[in-house]
């Protein structure tokens, strides 16, 4: 305020402007809840009766406990106990002692008695997601859902979470081809492209496949390959110029993520 005091956002009549569209935001929240809660039921059914769930069958208990330990050390409870001067032995005892707590479930909150350590394993069972919708013309964010439940899971999957970019990375390979003199009308045979394990430093030979066989053994243009997201075309470009050239171009364009220079980059396998 002009007099040096802080504004009260609730009582001082401030106006908050946002690009969020309330109708789209409502649809986004409802859509995420409907879809993820349905997937969660399928997930429960899949792992029912399996003692190590939701971890792979070949995981040893030491590996599972290590994951739980990591979750424990990243928790707010652990940080507060460390700040209070508790030893690791004392903290472990506290985390294994049952206390009253409230847990998240898609059917509503559950009031129960559980050890903090067991609650971490319980929470590890949930499928998470986030979504953001942006107007491509203005860049305005119209809907934003960071996770399945802010009260219980304060991790923002939109801003912080990492995910494979997939086919959205393919235009970078086409850009490289154009940069190197290829025309959008340049034709490429739509046949399997094999990356030899010895030449490319792989464990075994690798030949990426297309999602369908509608255009098998046809000559297709770069333009058509991009429009239809055909894997064998980006694999062909990758084999012509190599992964280092692709990474260099991505960095020049402005991608700041760590990108491994490997053949599978042609399918957008990095986070």
What are these regions (language model features)?
Residues 1-201, 210-211, 223-224, 236, ...:
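Extended, non-catalytic substrate-recognition/exosite surfaces adjacent to catalytic cores, especially
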Residues 30-34, 231, 252:
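Residues within well-ordered alpha-helical secondary structure of globular protein domains
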Residues 160, 230-231, 255:
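A broad detector of the eukaryotic-type serine/threonine protein kinase catalytic domain
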Residues 202-208, 242-271:
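Mid-domain, small-residue-enriched loop/turn segments at the edges of structured enzyme/sensor domains
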Residues 208-242, 250:
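Metal-dependent DNA phosphodiester-chemistry modules and their immediately adjacent helices/loops
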